């Protein structure tokens, strides 16, 4: 016999829809950043494309470093009874989205006060530090959003991830399009 997938239960689940929204939002945010980071560094900070390609790697290194820490921290908080599993997921996703929002607001603040023609190395260092913080905080998605499917239904986690990932792919497409559009008209 085949696997009887409870599609109607997914659609009616009050826990499933926030997971889908979080996944859509994560992809909208992250793929927009990933796609346009070299262009941003070139246009906003007057950095050559060759140098901006190198600088674009730095935030990813932050993600790799922080990723090695988030699971042990999240597991420790749950295993020691400091936070429930649900609270660990909420904390993780809050750190992911909240950290990104603070970091990108900081980047916007720095860039808005510095005309591209007069960008100093200190400005580049400040912006890259904020972006590294942003990408590092994004690592918390691994103990937030990406554990939610398994928490809701271990048996159907892969199917639920496929559904939310499909919606999230639309977010990726929209963000890269709209960011490009707004850059073109501004």
Locations of regions flagged by a protein language model:
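A late C-terminal transmembrane helix in Major Facilitator Superfamily
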Residues: 67-68, 154-185
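Interfacial helix-cap and linker-helix signal at transmembrane-aqueous boundaries
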Residues: 41-42, 73-74, 78, 178-186
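Flexible cytoplasmic inter-helical loops of multi-pass small-molecule transporters
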Residues: 1-5
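Alpha-helical transmembrane segments of MFS and MFS-like solute carriers/permeases
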Residues: 8, 14-26, 58, 96, ...
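Extracytoplasmic gate region of multi-pass secondary transporters
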Residues: 11-71, 108, 138-150, 172-176
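Loop-to-transmembrane helix entry
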Residues: 44-62, 88-90, 125-129, 159-162
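C-terminal transmembrane helical hairpin of 12-TM major facilitator-type secondary transporters
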Residues: 86-144
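Paired intracellular helix-loop junctions of major facilitator superfamily
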Residues: 79-80, 148-158
């Amino acid at each position: 016999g085949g696997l009887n997938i409870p599609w109607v239960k997914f659609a009616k689940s009050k826990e499933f829809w926030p997971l889908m929204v979080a996944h859509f939002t994560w992809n909208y945010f992250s793929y927009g950043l990933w796609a346009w980071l070299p262009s941003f560094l070139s246009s906003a900070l007057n950095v050559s494309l060759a140098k901006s390609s190198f600088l674009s790697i730095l935030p990813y290194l932050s993600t790799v470093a922080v990723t090695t820490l988030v699971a042990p921290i999240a597991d420790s908080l749950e295993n020691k009874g400091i936070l429930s599993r649900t609270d660990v997921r909420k904390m993780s996703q809050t750190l992911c989205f909240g950290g990104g929002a603070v970091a990108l607001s900081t980047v916007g603040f720095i860039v808005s006060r510095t005309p591209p023609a007069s960008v100093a190395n200190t400005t580049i260092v400040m912006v890259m530090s904020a972006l590294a913080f942003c990408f590092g905080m994004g690592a918390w998605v691994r103990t937030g959003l990406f554990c939610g499917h398994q928490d809701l239904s271990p048996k159907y986690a892969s199917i639920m991830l496929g559904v939310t990932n499909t919606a999230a792919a639309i977010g990726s497409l929209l963000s890269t399009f709209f960011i490009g559009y707004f850059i073109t008209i501004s």
